[in-house]
Amino acid sequence: MSVVTHIYPAYINGVLTKANSWTADTVNCALFSASTFTNTDTTYTTSGTEVASANGYTTGGGAVGTRTISSQTTTPQLCKITGAFGGGAAGTTTWTATGAGFTAVAAKLYVVSGVPICNVDFGGSQTASGGGTFTITWDATNGVFNAASS
């Protein structure tokens, strides 16, 4: 299973027009039962295929914590998550499953004020059983996503 990340054009536009900031905005991570990336999405919504509020997951997900950008002289610019959500290690987003647990095939990062950032397709179903954890470990080397110019 390969993980594929798609960045929403609305977020790129927001960064270029200074309406959004990877390091300053409050960013959440939500889990989905289907990968639903659409280039035309301009607003994050909890409707559709987001994992339901139950068994240790809450609709809307949770804040991912601290984010960084590599040095402006580095190519590509690496956008990383270095904080933690859910009591996990730095650079992770974690939920503790209860009851029957839950399953997700994708995660979406979004600015809490409404702009979707990216869709992370896990390449298949990932399940956390009751008492287990569902952990996303963000790539500490290459970042969640990057931007490069030539």
Spans of features found by a protein language model:
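Small cysteine-rich, disulfide-bonded extracellular modules of the LU/uPAR three-finger superfamily
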Residues: 1-105, 112-150
